[in-house]
């Protein structure tokens, strides 16, 4: 039997941070179309474009994220990207212009791309090499659990808290 531990404080922190990252992502994903339609009165095509800006930005930053993580200290890059990712949620609430919302969406995607690559890299650094596959499996499980509950809770909160549909 292998005595290399997976469950360490560092692993628990990165696992919890990964769950919260994806939970936040999936929490707002199903309600953003409603928000964009109601706040900016735009059509489905524009909503689709705005939502895709996030993913495209995340895709564009990932190759550069790997280089940055190999060149600079990983933990500070991870924490800065995570902070930006979190702060952008507040920006969505105060964005009164559609162009500002789109810009926030792009920055949010960059932060998401950076923090996911950084999280995966840090995970590999902290796992014992003999149990990396198992540790990565648990780490990925956090994404799936967030995917299972995030959209449901987001839509529930939207239905519960949004009052303009009550008329």
Model-derived features: positions:
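Helix-loop boundary and gating motifs at the non-cytosolic
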Residues: 10-40, 47
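Helix-breaking motifs and short loop linkers at transmembrane-helix boundaries and internal kinks
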Residues: 41, 73, 94-99
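Residue-level signature of mid-helix packing/kink "hotspots" within the transmembrane helices
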Residues: 55-63, 147-148
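Helix-to-loop junctions at the C-terminal end of transmembrane segments
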Residues: 62-73
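Structural signature of the two symmetry-related core transmembrane helices
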Residues: 76-90
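Paired small-residue
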Residues: 99-107
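Cytoplasmic helix-loop-helix junction between adjacent transmembrane helices
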Residues: 106-141
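Conserved small/polar residues in nucleotide/adenosyl-binding loops
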Residues: 162-167
